[in-house]
Amino acid sequence: LRENKSGGASSIQTSLPARNIGLSGRFTYAYDGRYFAEANFGYNGSERFAKNERFGFFPSIGAGWMISEEKFWNQDLKNIINKLKLKGTYGLVGNDNIGAWNDRFFYMSEVNLNGSGANFSWGQDFERNVGTIDMIRYRNDKIKWEIAQKMNLGLEVGLFNIFDIQFDYFTEYRKNIFGERQTIPYEMGFSAPLYANKGEASSHGFEVQVDANHAFNKNFWLGVRGNFTYANMSM
């Protein structure tokens, strides 16, 4: 259970403690320095969503194979390729940090009882004024976690006990992105914006890192690192 409090809140809503609850676990497995596996999960709850959307389950898995530790990888190969490893991961990541801080409780409407859109005056000198009620936000019980699906495939290569090369290809697909609806006709009579989990985005790319290390003697060695990253995103 995690609780955050704001000391400079500007309203009753933002002054309330923010609370999240979560349960997580991790399982790892390794055999003979050759085979590796890992599984993680998170079961998280957020106060920002209605009861039917409050909790989300976000698992991930990963695996690796150290090919250079297999018996068929003889010494002649190791003198050239001293390390060869394949690895991959896939998982889901949830995000409840969406919208503005004033929009904490999406399942509750918010109104301003002293609205400035119109007011009424009466009395002999018209000194009595009553403001109207302004709608700030409409409730939406369907607002839920933003979810990112992430995948990574990697290759690690060691050459001549000098060079270490890492190559990673990654993809990410995000859905349920929170945003304002732009296609609501004025004839429907809404006086405040409408929000929903309406967006999607995807990205992919790769990253290459090369390290070179060489010891000239016991007192002098040299290390050099270079990397390159490419990423492309579409919405």
Roles of regions detected by a PLM:
Residues 1-235:
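Extracellular/periplasmic, surface-exposed regions of secreted and cell-surface proteins
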